[in-house]
């Protein structure tokens, strides 16, 4: 699986879902259960590193998501 860096582009806190835009332009689904710090929340604009893995309905998603911001 690819390891990528990107930015949280969309985040719906009540639903715990969003989108990561990778530095190479791909849009990956993001689920709160994939946030490595266990907080289950993030913010639009946060820089992240993740693995790309299979998601629902054949879409790719961000997995093992770690924040890059200090």
Regions found by a protein language model. Name each.
Residues 14-20:
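Short aromatic-glycine-enriched beta-strand elements
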Residues 53-70:
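OB-fold/S1-family single-stranded nucleic acid-binding modules
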Residues 10, 22, 34, 64-67:
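A residue-level detector for short acidic-glycine micro-motifs
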Residues 1-14:
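Structural detector for short beta-strands of small beta-barrel domains
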Residues 7, 19, 49-51, 61:
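Residues located in well-ordered beta-strands
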Residues 26-34:
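A short macromolecule-binding patch
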């Amino acid at each position: 699986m690819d390891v990528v860096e990107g930015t949280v582009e969309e985040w719906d806190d009540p639903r715990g879902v969003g989108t990561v835009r990778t530095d190479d332009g791909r849009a990956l689904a993001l689920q709160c259960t994939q946030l490595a710090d266990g907080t289950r929340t993030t913010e639009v604009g946060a820089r992240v590193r993740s693995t790309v893995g299979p998601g629902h309905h054949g879409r790719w998603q961000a997995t093992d998501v770690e924040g890059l911001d200090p």
